[in-house]
């Protein structure tokens, strides 16, 4: 081999020996045995410095701490800070504490205001409902009392007006609010002819039956004890509502009426 350069005729620098590549992986592991193994994720978190707790964590921790209630917020805050060993606060720390206390007071005031407002609204609603119910009851009681008084009036005109008021029917009246005892008193005060008219109207319009054969029975009024007397008055007040509210009773009364007819001898008219 030529050991001199062509141009300068100076000797060439020595060529380093070429190292053969390592083909056995075991040899490589042996060479790296003295290096530290990489840490897994859990180990890295373990050796890392702990992170600072968040504000939520601190708040949750303080919620579990004992505190003396019944004192102003600043007194309770100072007592709690003294228990933690934070006696000397900087101006910035005091400002942060003041912001927290003020926000707590505002939240408490808002909650109290919302609760009080809801209580007032509910109370007003209940009072209005009770007042409306009492007004309706008094109005209907006054109407029944007026009708009762007119039925006992010596004036024929007054009695006729009372009967017209009973049989006319006021569809705007809520019969569920009427006093049953008051309606029964009205029935007792009515004359016999007026009662017969009320019964005939009830049988034909409410039970929807033909009472012609029934009237042929001697003492037919004695066989109507399955109909409460206040039903005649209530049906005259609001027949549409009566048919809806007392539909089951109407079905039972119609069946009872048919049983009475089937047990009595039929009379040819």
From Swiss-Prot:
<keyword id="KW-0597">Phosphoprotein</keyword>
<keyword id="KW-0143">Chaperone</keyword>
<dbReference type="GO" id="GO:0030430">
    <property type="term" value="C:host cell cytoplasm"/>
</dbReference>
<keyword id="KW-1035">Host cytoplasm</keyword>
<dbReference type="GO" id="GO:0044423">
    <property type="term" value="C:virion component"/>
</dbReference>
<comment type="subunit">
    <text>Homotrimer when phosphorylated. This trimer is stabilized by binding to the L protein. Binds soluble protein N, and ribonucleocapsid.</text>
</comment>
<comment type="similarity">
    <text>Belongs to the nucleorhabdovirus protein P family.</text>
</comment>
<feature type="region of interest" description="Disordered">
    <location>
        <begin position="1"/>
        <end position="27"/>
    </location>
</feature>
<protein>
    <recommendedName>
        <fullName>Phosphoprotein</fullName>
    </recommendedName>
</protein>
<keyword id="KW-0693">Viral RNA replication</keyword>
<comment type="function">
    <text>Non catalytic polymerase cofactor and regulatory protein that plays a role in viral transcription and replication. Stabilizes the RNA polymerase L to the N-RNA template and binds the soluble protein N, preventing it from encapsidating non-genomic RNA.</text>
</comment>
<keyword id="KW-0946">Virion</keyword>
<feature type="compositionally biased region" description="Basic residues">
    <location>
        <begin position="1"/>
        <end position="10"/>
    </location>
</feature>
